[in-house]
């Protein structure tokens, strides 16, 4: 879908809120890093660096202090380590013809050390977004205490109430193909500034996103390194949260609809007693959403 949308330049800025607060990195404590190392999932696989989570967990007491120093240095200088930006991609066959690439689901595996860096940052940025109330209440995805069930119950309740009142209900469901891959890095970094993440903090996210690479592993053989020019990092800790930030302002284009989001899965609902009028209203109200998609969802 992204490839079919005409990009609208800098129009995406018109949907963004005015900046009212500012985010600054806090110094990461040695205790936080130690607990993250201790809590690593030993069953997870390792990345291209071949450092297994079990090894990190087992050596937590020896490495937590130097690792804390490196993480804080990364935040202070706005530089994410290049060696942690290379992913190992394993294609998993789904169904159909094995000769078609679309019939495989890519599993991206990053360095286990990268997860420690990212969790430290995620803890801070999550607290900031919650404290400042920056996320739309219509987002149910990747948020503590919210589930797909909550989203579905809310939708069913609205439709039930409408039917009880003798109204028709119309819902439009959007499913963006490979949505996490359609994130434009330049647009995302600009959005972070609008949400108060600027200066060295924005530079860190710039470093985190850019110049990422991947190697595909098939039958024990690795491909050459391939550059990744768009999207949030697959298999990462910060990726889903960054996508929520990216899509957060879509509510500015859906004021006529009742909006519900679960990450990229979007439902838009309208009700009216007159069916013909309802369809007419829905067609007209969808135009601003199309404009938002044109302004935001694209490959660079």
Feature map (PLM): residue ranges:
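Surface-exposed loop/turn segments and immediately adjacent short secondary-structure elements
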Residues: 1-102, 108, 112, 116, ...
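Conserved catalytic palm subdomain of right-hand nucleotidyl-transferase polymerases, strongest
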Residues: 42-51, 100-109, 150-190
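Conserved polymerase palm-domain catalytic core
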Residues: 176-261
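Active-site palm subdomain of RNA-directed nucleic acid polymerases
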Residues: 121-139, 240-270
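Catalytic palm subdomain of template-directed nucleic-acid polymerases
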Residues: 179-195, 267-290
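Catalytic palm active-site di-aspartate
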Residues: 86-89, 105, 139, 169-179, ...
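Polymerase palm active-site segment centered on the conserved acidic dipeptide of motif C
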Residues: 197-203, 258-261, 275-300
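Inter-domain linker/hinge segments that demarcate the starts of reverse transcriptase
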Residues: 30-38, 66-73, 123-125, 151-162, ...
